[in-house]
């Protein structure tokens, strides 16, 4: 019998989120990694990596870090301060039912929400098919030829529609007409977009105030924000006669019952797909849509999924016409948008797949019937209801009773819309119940039930839809939930996301999106709040926004933040507008020159162009640093008109430049402001603050540094932080402070995903965030050290260090073996990895960012794969392997390759199970290498006909 030993207390913390859950390497592994790099301590590595001049003086501190349970309790306490009423406010945001099969298997599934933008098509086939379904759905419902894979929100899409109209219009006019019945936030964003570009905006009644000769385009709301349903066919014909372009902002659910914009002759249709199963979420995120006529498709902004073939001739999907995008076209791009809303577009497309055309039409009919019943009840009470015909929205003039009725409705648990000083509006939706109608009638003084009225239709007969939609078999095959679940699973199995392996994309920060951070976004206290509810119903949101703002200010050294921008690119746009407005307020509106280094993100020059700035390009030295002499020369040359500079720190080359403070001082000396792109903030948190370095404004990518998942290409969040002197010029919003300058449809952007970043901050604490930054730098330097000798690291600091990412040079392989960077990327798929960022910021290179969340084992697996690829290239160099028919040129290999006839001069095992690949759980690419040229030359952007599915199966 053993003698009991004395009980020993331990300091082990099983629920230490920062060190045990978020940060990948253990302390012992960090010690081993540091030895490989040549350091005895993590702090020693950090001291050698960051210039002392940019280090922050005080540590990042804010309370003790919380455990997951403590953080969730805090989130629950905060969420309970929001009041969840039934909101009939409408105005572009409507109650909807998210089918549980979609919520559980897509919204809450890391296979969908942790994926990256599908720039590597072979490992994105599932997402690309879902997005092709989305584009098909939009084309069918709008009656137009080509749709993109989503935009940020409806108001942004409308502003993009205006910009596109100006590009393709034959008119020389510099004015754009806006239907006064557009949603107020849409009008606000159009004004914001137009003003810096010198376009005037005319708001009025299109049937009385529009002269097509005076404008390059016009936008009409269909149905209108107050419910009117008009046929714009005649107006559109008149616009075309004058060489102008027509844009129709259409309710996607109404289009199941109403004549499509395409049938009216519209050139462009925009709108939101939110009411296809995506919660309102206090403003977002939601997927906006844009569809256009075929003749103008190459001028359309955003991503476009198309059909191509792979190396075997099998059908494959890819992003088409990428040369339009900002990362290639820079200031000549159609837009600065590089973020779509993929996760939300996928949800909306699956809503259509789940319900099919009959189901969606039935939902629309039921919504309309509810609106008719509501109108009948109000008319019985003696109120005049407008308009006479409508889809889901009505307006009632109640005179001096407005305030009393609005308060009475709130007491009944219902929010109605305040319209002017005497009217009340209401929009019925999928979630409206009979009890809600009866509650509204009581607020108006009635006391009857829904059984007192007969349902009927009040849609204008001349506008009833007669054309089919959603005819493709995909919208008819998944009625049973068993089939729907399997379809979603089949698609997700075709993709490679963070739930399978690390995604080492440079400048993308694909870190852990912890489950505890994700849980609150589906709580109704966050997801079911309309963005325009009275302030006292969103006190929980207010508390969270204030605390997150305070934390972000502490991280950055800024004094104020705007949470409005829905993406990093939109943050750039908002930040540059803030700078522009600051100069105008100081009587220096002539300052319009923006200095941008050649190494900058492509969004930087595209954003500068959007706010009317002139881009002056600054050279970069051979070592990757900004050429200080060239910068000084150009700053002095343009001193009288210098507005700002845009720099990224650490640089896009993955190095902390030592001259950054001097650059900031030069800009300030000549009257400009400094915009520091926050894309690489994951290398700075807790160690260095942009506001201390000399920057005036930055955006933060919350979908990078602060754990919001990339969602396969969106959602994102790009809030901007500013120093105090710029704070008065931050974006306003018509529904909050009434100030101009709105950049998003909702005042706080995609507010419902902010709990992710907030809970990350709560669980990490200041010390944990700082440690995460240090480990991100450690992991990048470890990879650089492991790959040394096989690949050159292109840029290092004077001390031989990289920041949180490194660029390896694969260009020598082209001359020695014929192996391209594309070959390396596709071979990594065979190893089970998403490729690092390809050919940016330097063509023919790979930029690797491992983040702090990856374990040493995963880093080693990646390094083994990269080293094995180098050995395969060496075999080609030595003549041991054919220069054309080899594993690199034929990658990725599929199951079809494995089981088919094999006539290649290397083995099946070498092809399919290279070092780094799992044998039991191997990821198999569903297609061989995709033919990009074929896809652009034979552009198909909707679901292929059913015959092609049969052909593909043969």
Swiss-Prot record:
GO terms for cellular component: cytosol; glycine cleavage complex. It catalyses: N(6)-[(R)-lipoyl]-L-lysyl-[glycine-cleavage complex H protein] + glycine + H(+) = N(6)-[(R)-S(8)-aminomethyldihydrolipoyl]-L-lysyl-[glycine-cleavage complex H protein] + CO2. HAMAP family: GcvP. Pfam families: GcvP2_C, GDC-P. The keyword Oxidoreductase applies. CDD domains: GDC-P (cd00613). Its cofactor is pyridoxal 5'-phosphate. Keywords: Oxidoreductase, Pyridoxal phosphate. Signal peptide: none annotated. It is an enzyme of class 1 (oxidoreductase). The glycine cleavage system catalyzes the degradation of glycine. The P protein binds the alpha-amino group of glycine through its pyridoxal phosphate cofactor; CO(2) is released and the remaining methylamine moiety is then transferred to the lipoamide cofactor of the H protein. InterPro entries: GcvP, GDC-P_C, GDC-P_N, GDC_P, PyrdxlP-dep_Trfase, PyrdxlP-dep_Trfase_major, PyrdxlP-dep_Trfase_small. GO terms for molecular function: glycine binding; glycine dehydrogenase (decarboxylating) activity; pyridoxal phosphate binding. Belongs to the GcvP family. The gene is gcvP. The modification N6-(pyridoxal phosphate)lysine is found at residue 704. This is Glycine dehydrogenase (decarboxylating). It comes from the Bacteria. GO terms for biological process: glycine decarboxylation via glycine cleavage system.
